[in-house]
Each structure stands twice: as C-alpha cells, then as structure tokens.
C-alpha cells in the first residue's frame, strides 16, 4: 500500500473514531438529561420539519406539547402497551421471542416485512435516530435502547414515548393528538379514544385517526380486547406505570 493511501486511511480512521466519541458523548448526555428533563423535540420531528421545508412546505409545523404521566389518561399508556409491546414491563428492551418470530415471518414473506421493535426501541429510534432501515441504524438503536433501559425507569420510557410518538401529519405526542382529534387534554381520553390513537401506530401517515379505515377500526377493537385481557387500569398500577 502506498504512503498516500496509508495517509488517507489513517485520516478516515481518526475521523470515524472522533465522530464515534462525539456521538457517544452527545447521545449519552441526551439519555442522562432526558431522564429528568422534558424532551423539547425528537430526531423524527426534526427530520419531518426539514423535509417539509426542503419540499417548499413552510406551513408545516411539527408540534408537540410535553405532559407528565399524571397528565395522561392511564388508558393511553395501556393502549400502546396492548398494541405495540405487551411484554414492556418485563423485558430489558428487546423481545427476543418476537424478534425470532419476525425473522421467520420475513424469510417466508419478503414483500411483507414484519417488525418486532419494543416501545423502548421505538423510543430510542424516534428520539435520537433517523428514519429508515439499515444494519448501522439498527446497531445504534440497540445501543441506545440498552442505554435508556439502564438509566430510565419503565415509567420514564413510556412517558417519553407517549410525548414524541407521531400520531399524524405534524402531530407529535399524545397531548397534541388529544387536542387535535378529540378537542380535549390527554388526561381526559377515554378507553376507546386511546385505542383509536394506538391503532394508527406505527404508521400514522398511512392510517388516519381523523378518518379511520376499516382496518383501523378493526385494530382498535382488537386493542380494546387486549387492554381488557391485560387487566385494565390495575395493570398500569401493578407495574408502577401510571
């Protein structure tokens, strides 16, 4: 290898190492800070806002209103757990059984990819990472998930998730969603309304709360049944998530 190639290789390696250190400090600081402080915006919100501006849509505003868990209806937390991650109180950030099932499904159905992301993984991804599918992003997501599972309580993870989840075009967080679709604060959401919001996850740009399709209504009904089977509100109290 020539001296010039060695120099370039050495430069690239040093740059990547420094970048990794900077990102580790940035993400580690974010995990520590947001363990107690409200989250003002997420990476997904920034991505959506920048994309809108680049497409000339200057009326788009990614909007979120932070609320604490005691300002969120317990039905809402239960609904997203029933819909997205029923083992949330028990696992350490990853649902291994669901991952194995998803991998087996995806091998058989290449055109219908099934995910197995837990609420913890979705929180890490939405808060810190870009959208899309790649092994690099998945690796970073895994590391960040371990970080928030180590530093945050399950209640904190659920609180952040509910405050940054996307529920529609420019609608981020359960408070903004409750006000937009039901004209009430998140604390007043009913069981049925919470299930409807959860029914559009994790694809709220395709499925609409304001104009629910037959699929969304069917999923809402399924979520309501799962909420009942989990035990209703006592489930949240039992696992100290309310």
UniProtKB/Swiss-Prot annotation:
Reaction equations catalysed: [GlcNAc-(1->4)-Mur2Ac(oyl-L-Ala-gamma-D-Glu-L-Lys-D-Ala-D-Ala)](n)-di-trans,octa-cis-undecaprenyl diphosphate + beta-D-GlcNAc-(1->4)-Mur2Ac(oyl-L-Ala-gamma-D-Glu-L-Lys-D-Ala-D-Ala)-di-trans,octa-cis-undecaprenyl diphosphate = [GlcNAc-(1->4)-Mur2Ac(oyl-L-Ala-gamma-D-Glu-L-Lys-D-Ala-D-Ala)](n+1)-di-trans,octa-cis-undecaprenyl diphosphate + di-trans,octa-cis-undecaprenyl diphosphate + H(+)
Sequence intervals crossing the membrane: 19-39
Subcellular location: Cell inner membrane
Membrane topology qualifier: Single-pass membrane protein
Pathways per UniProt: Cell wall biogenesis; peptidoglycan biosynthesis
EC number: 2.4.99.28
GO process terms (BP): cell wall organization; peptidoglycan biosynthetic process; regulation of cell shape
Enzyme class, UniProt record, top EC level: transferase
Keywords tagged on the record: Cell inner membrane, Cell membrane, Cell shape, Cell wall biogenesis/degradation, Glycosyltransferase, Membrane, Peptidoglycan synthesis, Transferase, Transmembrane, Transmembrane helix
GO CC annotations on file: peptidoglycan-based cell wall; plasma membrane
Pfam families: Transgly
SUPFAM superfamilies recorded: Lysozyme-like
Molecular functions per Gene Ontology: pentosyltransferase activity; peptidoglycan glycosyltransferase activity
InterPro entries: Glyco_trans_51 (IPR001264), Lysozyme-like_dom_sf (IPR023346), PBP_transglycosylase (IPR036950), Pep_trsgly (IPR011812)
Cited PANTHER family: BIOSYNTHETIC PEPTIDOGLYCAN TRANSGLYCOSYLASE, MONOFUNCTIONAL BIOSYNTHETIC PEPTIDOGLYCAN TRANSGLYCOSYLASE
Task of the protein: Peptidoglycan polymerase that catalyzes glycan chain elongation from lipid-linked precursors.
Family named by the database record: Belongs to the glycosyltransferase 51 family.
Xref: HAMAP family: PGT_MtgA
Name the record gives this protein: Biosynthetic peptidoglycan transglycosylase
């Amino acid at each position: 290898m020539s001296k010039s190639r060695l120099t370039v290789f050495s430069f690239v390696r040093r740059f990547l190492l420094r970048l990794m250190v900077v990102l580790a400090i940035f993400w580690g600081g974010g995990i520590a800070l947001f363990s107690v402080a409200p989250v003002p915006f997420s990476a997904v919100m920034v991505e959506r806002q920048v994309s809108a501006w680049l497409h000339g849509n200057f009326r788009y505003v990614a909007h979120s209103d932070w609320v604490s868990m005691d300002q969120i209806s317990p039905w809402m937390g239960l609904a997203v757990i029933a819909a997205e991650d029923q083992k949330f109180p028990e696992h350490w950030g990853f649902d291994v059984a669901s991952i194995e099932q998803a991998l087996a499904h995806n091998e058989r159905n290449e055109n219908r990819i099934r995910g197995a992301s837990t609420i913890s993984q979705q929180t890490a991804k939405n808060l810190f990472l870009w959208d899309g599918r790649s092994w690099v992003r998945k690796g970073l997501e895994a590391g960040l998930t371990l970080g928030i599972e180590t530093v945050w309580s399950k209640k904190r993870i659920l609180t952040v998730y509910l405050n940054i989840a996307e529920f529609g075009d420019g609608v981020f967080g359960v408070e903004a969603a409750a006000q937009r679709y039901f004209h009430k604060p998140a604390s007043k959401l009913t069981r049925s309304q919470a299930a409807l919001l959860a029914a559009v996850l994790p694809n709220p740009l395709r499925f609409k709360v304001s104009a629910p399709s037959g699929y969304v209504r069917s999923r809402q009904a399924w979520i309501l049944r799962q909420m009942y089977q989990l035990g209703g509100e006592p489930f949240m109290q039992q696992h100290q998530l309310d």
